Amino acid sequence: METIAFRMVLNPGQSEEYRRRHREIWPELVETLREAGIRDYWIFLDDATNHLFAVLKRERDHRMDQLVTDDVMRKWWGFMSDIMATGSDGAPAQKPLVPMFYLP
């Protein structure tokens, strides 16, 4: 398993809506993420900057790169696009984070 982290940006005033939508996450999206090899997925909010920090584990043979063409994933991204920054492909704008320290 590999651990990765990335940053996204939430629109101001949307933290409760973001939380609500994730409380009601679609079962088919959960299945899609798991089938892509994603495990132990956390998203944290820095409410001073509206930055979301995601940390997840992925299997060595993950298929995260294929999520961009998955219908369920694209539908979710469209559903979330009104409350967060997105890229030209409709996916949330993401900035990979560089590991700086690890305590096993």
UniProtKB/Swiss-Prot annotation:
Keyword Lipid biosynthesis recorded: no
Q: Where in the cell is it found?
A: Cytoplasm
Instruction: Please indicate which superkingdom the organism of origin belongs to.
Output: Bacteria
User: Quick one: which pathway?
Assistant: Carbohydrate metabolism; L-rhamnose metabolism
TM region positions: none
Provide the residue positions that the database annotates as binding substrate.
18, 41, 76-77
**Catalytic activity, reaction form:** alpha-L-rhamnose = beta-L-rhamnose
Say which enzyme class the record assigns: isomerase
Extract one GO cellular component term from the record.
cytoplasm
Q: Which Pfam families match?
A: rhaM
EC annotation?
Answer: 5.1.3.32
Q: What residues sit in the active site?
A: 22
User: Any idea which UniProt keywords this protein has?
Assistant: Carbohydrate metabolism, Cytoplasm, Isomerase, Rhamnose metabolism
Q: Which GO terms describe its biological process?
A: rhamnose catabolic process
A single Gene Ontology MF term assigned here is: L-rhamnose mutarotase activity
Q: What family name appears in the similarity comment?
A: Belongs to the rhamnose mutarotase family.
What is the role of the protein in this entry?
Answer: Involved in the anomeric conversion of L-rhamnose.
Q: How does it assemble?
A: Homodimer.
Which PANTHER family does the entry mention?
A: L-RHAMNOSE MUTAROTASE
The protein depicted here goes by the name L-rhamnose mutarotase
Organism (species): Burkholderia ambifaria (strain MC40-6)
High-level lineage: Bacteria, Pseudomonadati, Pseudomonadota, Betaproteobacteria, Burkholderiales
Gene symbol? rhaM
